[in-house]
Curated annotation (Swiss-Prot):
Disulfide bonds: none annotated. It comes from Shewanella sp. (strain MR-7). It comes from the Bacteria. Mg(2+) binds at residues 485, 491. The lineage of its organism: Bacteria, Pseudomonadati, Pseudomonadota, Gammaproteobacteria, Alteromonadales. Belongs to the polyribonucleotide nucleotidyltransferase family. GO terms for cellular component: cytosol. It catalyses: RNA(n+1) + phosphate = RNA(n) + a ribonucleoside 5'-diphosphate. Residues 552-611 form the KH domain. It is found in: Cytoplasm. Involved in mRNA degradation. Catalyzes the phosphorolysis of single-stranded polyribonucleotides processively in the 3'- to 5'-direction. Its cofactor is Mg(2+). It holds the Pfam family RNase_PH_C. This is Polyribonucleotide nucleotidyltransferase.
Length: 699
């Protein structure tokens, strides 16, 4: 075994790429390290494509092994199971920039598996996973227009930081991942604290500039370790068939795309395509209908793009910078804690907000450590939203990714736990879809949070931008439709406030997207965002003054931290009885903070009263009503407060001489006592006769 190793400095860390030792039966295997975070990336491609396949079956599997962090998995089986949300998101992060680098017409199955085998808790594994994937594909011999670079960019004290550590990220106003080739940015994913557009654009340019060292290193690694290129050539177009398809369908498709209603347009496009295929079959029964379908799709794309480049109205009749008609409603569901219905053209989101206590927060145990997520946002895309049938069940990768994007857009304006001690779960149900449903979820979430009384800092709106570029001519489109996303060259989603950007996601399908184009897109997105915010603010301009009557109200009190064990009781008996008997939820913190949650105000008051009883100190000289709990020869023990007992000595029972305690007191008898003394050991001395004397004097 002769390993080939390439090392280089990248930001604060040393990156090492190694091949030739592990997983040698794969087409390519790279052990990639950034500091102590190490991933094994393998690539396998099938040499032959399945006959008739008209799509590229690329699979990216990213898996985090708990042994990488020196942990044993939880649960009964004690082994890793289905991918976590974090694993799904990182798999998508890797997939998105590499997919457009495979050539058109390449339909061989390719599988990339990234396994995290060692992790430094200060170095996230996503960037080195992207670098390792790029290196493995570069040396595999599989057709791939790489290499690809990747970088994380932070923004701390007005300065960009390359590949910040986890600790640095906690103090950063920006968490941006950018990936691209030597000449083009291909993918951006980010979360920001309402930063100006110029700062966001600068971070993309900075990250792309910095990753050139990665691209150069992988090119050198490929020169030394690369396998022979596959003997693959792109399929040659059947020019005669192309001309026939154009003649039969171009005019009909152009006419169909004059129809502005989505379902009607789709129906007419289907009619045109069916007629073209029927005519081709009549002329040549041996014609390959799959090839015809591909040519019709290409022609359809050319027709729509040509209209836009020529300055003609878009598919639905809008100008490039126009936003579709908006409808905004807040408080649409009677029993939810907050709700909103946001409609933009043929895209609609029904969004709900539910408030819970701290114990409702999501506990996440990953190889990077444990964390608690108080704000959750879940996105659902049922098949009826696009007029189709389909499977309904656990969320797919796309739904998880869109939900996380919307979460990033909102997270910057969420209140702290001190400002709002609730866990918050938002669910966005996409009830109609024709493009930009994730950004509709951002708008709907902002509205639902305000309706629920969550004190978010300000409203947030999102917009999806698109691009059509032919040569040097380009048109940036605001609020793209589903068709414009599919047929265009860029999907550019921006969420933010009036003051700045909170989330930016960009996927680019072509090279040649310049800084100028991105700048125009960001400025056009800002205008669209402000327009949407103006409409949203007319429906609900700020958060409600109070939370819903149906939501749990959290009341916070402070107790002596030394009294926490008294509230909990032996084996949790006291707090269990408190919650069951009052119907409240009670949470205790180490500093003595007690949070009582209930939608019933009287129940909360009763819980507070009982907690104050349990934690109150015994006062010398004070009169208490107590209960006899034990009788002994020398007196009786009386309970005066929860968990607080004292001794009434036989001499303190009565002014008369007492020979037998049982002649005067019995178990469970209620008596009035006066606290005479609390000694250094906390023992309480009580008197019945002194209490009677004091009461008599008061009368």
């Amino acid at each position: 075994m002769n390993p080939i190793v390439k090392s280089f400095e990248y930001g604060q860390h040393t990156v090492t790429l190694e091949t030739g030792v592990i997983a040698r039966q794969a087409d390519a295997a790279v052990l990639a390290s950034m500091g102590d975070t190490t991933v094994l990336v393998t690539v396998v491609g099938k040499k032959e494509a399945e006959a008739g396949r008209d799509f590229f079956p690329l699979t990216v599997n990213y898996q985090e092994k708990t042994y990488a962090a020196g942990k044993i998995p939880g649960g009964f089986f004690k082994r890793e199971g289905r991918p976590s949300e974090d694993e799904t998101l990182i798999a998508r992060l890797i997939d998105r920039p590499i997919r457009p680098l495979f050539p058109n017409g390449f339909t061989n199955e390719v599988q990339v598996i990234i396994t995290v085998v060692s992790v430094d808790p200060q170095i996230e594994p996503d960037i080195i996973s992207m670098i390792g994937t790029s290196a493995a594909l570069a040396i595999s011999g599989i057709p791939f227009s790489g290499p690809l670079g990747a970088a994380r960019v932070g923004y701390i004290n007005g300065e960009y930081v390359l590949n910040p550590t986890v600790t640095q990220l906690a103090n950063s106003q920006l968490n941006l991942v950018v990936a691209g080739t030597e000449g083009a940015v291909l993918m951006v994913e980010s979360e920001a604290q309402a930063l100006p557009e110029e700062v966001m654009l600068g971070s993309v340019v900075y990250g792309h500039d910095q990753q050139q060292v990665v691209i150069k290193a992988i090119a050198e690694f490929k020169a030394e370790a690369g396998k022979p290129a596959w003997n693959w050539t792109a399929p040659v177009a059947n020019e005669a068939l192309v001309a026939q398809v154009k003649e039969l369908a171009e005019a009909g498709l152009a006419q169909a795309y004059q129809i502005q209603v989505k379902q009607e347009r789709y129906a007419q496009v289907a009619v045109v395509k069916a007629a073209a295929k029927e005519a081709l079959l009549a002329a040549n029964p041996e014609v390959d209908l799959r090839e015809v379908d591909g040519l019709l799709g290409s022609l359809e794309k050319k027709v729509v793009r040509g209209r836009i480049i020529r300055g003609e109205p878009r598919i639905d009749g809008r100008e490039p910078d126009m936003v579709r008609a908006l409808s905004v409603l807040a408080g649409v569901l009677p029993r939810t804690h907050g709700s909103a219905l946001f409609t933009r053209g043929e895209t609609q989101a029904l969004v709900t907000c539910t408030l819970g206590t701290e114990r409702d927060a999501q506990k996440i145990d990953s190889i990077m450590g444990e964390r608690t997520n108080r704000f959750m946002l879940h996105y659902n895309f049922p098949p009826y939203s696009v007029g189709e049938t389909g499977m309904v069940g656990s969320p797919k990768r796309r739904e998880i990714g869109h939900g996380k994007l919307a979460w990033r857009g909102i997270n910057a304006v969420m209140p702290t736990a001190e400002e709002f001690p609730y866990s918050v779960r938002v669910v966005s149900e996409i009830t109609e879809s024709n493009g930009s449903s994730s950004m509709a979820s951002v708008c709907g979430t902002s509205l639902a949070l305000m309706d629920a009384g969550v004190p978010i800092k300000t409203s947030v709106a999102g917009i999806a931008m698109g691009l059509v570029k032919e040569g040097d001519n380009f048109v940036v489109l605001s609020d793209i439709l589903g068709d414009e996303d599919h047929l265009g060259d860029m999907d550019f989603k921006v969420a933010g406030t009036r003051d700045g950007v909170t989330a930016l996601q960009m996927d680019i399908k072509i090279e040649g997207i310049t800084k100028e184009i991105m700048e125009i897109a960001l400025q056009q997105a800002y205008g669209a965002r402000v327009h949407i915010l103006n409409v949203m603010d007319q429906a609900i301009g700020s958060h409600r003054d109070d939370i819903s009557d149906h939501a749990p109200r959290i009341t916070t009190i402070k107790i002596n931290p030394e009294k926490i064990r008294d509230v909990i009781g032996k084996g949790g008996a006291v707090i269990r009885a408190l919650t069951e008997e009052t119907g409240t939820t009670i949470e205790l913190e180490d500093d003595g903070t007690v949070k009582i949650a209930s939608s019933n105000g009287e129940a909360t008051k009763e819980a507070i009263r009982r907690i104050e009883e349990i934690t109150s100190e015994v006062e010398v000289g004070r009169i208490y009503n107590g209960k006899v709990i034990r009788i002994v020869d020398f007196g009786a023990f009386v309970n005066i407060l929860p968990g607080k007992d004292g001794l009434v000595h036989i001499s303190q029972i009565s002014d008369e001489r007492v020979a037998n305690v049982s002649d005067h007191l019995e178990l469970n008898q209620e008596v009035t006592v006066k606290v005479m003394e609390v000694d250094r050991q906390g023992r309480v001395r009580l008197s019945i006769k002194e209490a009677q004397t004091k009461e008599a004097a008061a009368e």
